[in-house]
């Protein structure tokens, strides 16, 4: 039975830029930065000789988001179907005003893949 969300993980192309965005713009707290490699992480992620850099950032309520940068396999050198697997769908935050939050993110370097549509 699910009782809560432990954490979410999203793949980013550059960990340092992602840390800046999530801590300075979204204002999450940086908890930890670490590197992982070896047989264990290779088995979990399903890639031979996997090497990743990970930063944990936390919301004010303690929800953890893992920002993951792949070192090996390199997303640029992976086959197209593998590149698609080195991503995450999305992450959703509860906010007080969605339109203001959207505009704030765009003004501070956020990218919208589609025009925003706000529902009443």
List each model region and its residues.
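Short, solvent-exposed beta-strand edge segments and adjacent coil->beta transition regions
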Residues: 5-7, 52, 86-90
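Short secondary-structure boundary segments
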Residues: 1-15, 47, 116
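Core segments of cupin and vicinal oxygen chelate
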Residues: 11-62, 100, 107
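Vicinal oxygen chelate
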Residues: 13-16, 31-32, 59-63, 69-120
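A generic structural micro-feature
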Residues: 2, 46-49, 82-85
